UniProtKB/Swiss-Prot annotation:
It comes from Guillardia theta (Cryptophyte). It is found in: Plastid, Chloroplast. GO terms for cellular component: chloroplast. The keyword Plastid applies. Pfam families: CGLD27-like. Belongs to the ycf36 family. Transmembrane segments: none annotated. This is Uncharacterized protein ycf36.
Amino acid sequence: MNCPVPENQLPINEYNKLTSAWDFSWACKIGKLYYKFLLKMQLCLFLFFCICLNFLDSKYETGLYSLILSTLFICLICLRTYLGFRYIYVRLLKSALPYEESSWYDGQVWVKNINYLIKDRLVADYTVLPILSRLKISFTINFSFLICLLLRFIF
């Protein structure tokens, strides 16, 4: 039995599209490559903000401001990526998919057959869930660091 839901709306295809997108693919890196990429991104943002703040005025604590801004951006990037993968994770786990087309069958629901369901749940549990865990840890660490930097800035 073929799936009546359009190919681009199948959760597995949405997952494949998300992992190949340049702004989400970094989260799929494995182990040390993931953390190296995050550190490189943090360093590039830090240097960018240092240069920008130096052009504005030299009375600011450029290093601290740059670190706060780069950490804030990393938190926002992690949060955006987490929300994207979370959406896919929830769709992979669902046993029924709503149609998202604007035609006569809009709003109806297609129940996945057992083959689709097993395949989707395996991808969700063994591929997407570890990505979500890493993103959650990265966000927590960066957000904690951001709070410490803001406290240092205030006091």
